[in-house]
Amino acid sequence: VPTVMVDSALFAIRELMEKDPTCLLYGQDVGKRLGGVFREAATLAQQFGDERVFNTPIQEAFIIGSTVGMSAVGLKPIVEVQFADYIWPGLNQLFTEVSRSNYLTNGKWPVNMILRVPIGAYGSGGPYHSSSVESVVTNIKGIKVAYPSNGADLKGFIKSAYYDPNP
């Protein structure tokens, strides 16, 4: 039975959280009540608690920018913006803080974070849930962008990104 993308993300994040107590997951609706808009975080809040898996306000600049502070105190956040269309308010933080920290500090302050941005999801999301933003974010120096085509690649990309000191 093939594993769908959503399950691959869930399994990868669960394995990372089981192995590393500094791993956090937060973002829009990933907490206990919903477990992600696509259920990609289902059961994680129950398993790891509200201190490690929690919802944030719908404030993408905060979600992305907070990873700088979380990394500075030794945590390794995995954050999610619900849909690619929603990333725009957070681009300033991604471009000016997250992407440059490791290089500006000569490796002293890496931002160990993963930013998950679901894109190309099933259904018809209309003009505000269906955009492709990769042509913009791939031009930001200092971050890596992965666009998996199957569940195995997604799981591998998440786990590889987690151990990379760059965002």
Q: How should these model regions be labeled?
A:
Residues V1-N166:
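Thiamine diphosphate
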